[in-house]
Regions:
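Short, conserved "active-site rim" segments that organize catalytic pockets and cofactor/ligand binding
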Residues: 1-76
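Alpha-helix C-terminal capping segments
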Residues: 53, 84-90
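A short mixed-secondary-structure module that forms the rim of ligand-binding clefts
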Residues: 72-86
């Protein structure tokens, strides 16, 4: 792992995950229930976490080549992720970037 990625992970762990972050504590204790599911391209320049600057637990994210959503077909990773998000977490909005 390159030094800058490792440093970023260590800062995240110290400040967000292990720090005194009430949002993270709440998500750990009560579970996650994001309102959004974002489907985006695998393009490294278009990262939803960077673009929207969300708080932890704001959305689920799925990356697909070209942000292409194929017809529903059980057994695909996107179908499984959408099923989980909608059925168990009651996601209200799906965004395709």
């Amino acid at each position: 792992m390159t030094d800058n990625l490792l440093k970023g992970f260590q800062e995240y762990r110290a400040s967000v995950y292990e720090g005194e972050n009430p949002i993270m504590d709440q998500l750990i204790k009560e579970g996650q229930n994001p309102d959004y599911f974002i489907i985006s391209c695998i393009d490294s320049r278009a990262n939803p976490g960077t673009i929207f600057k969300p708080a932890p637990g704001t959305f689920f994210a799925h990356k697909a080549m070209g942000a292409i959503v194929r017809p529903y077909n059980q057994g695909t990773a996107l179908a499984a992720a959408l099923h989980f998000a909608i059925t168990y977490n009651k996601v209200k909005t799906i965004i395709v970037m």
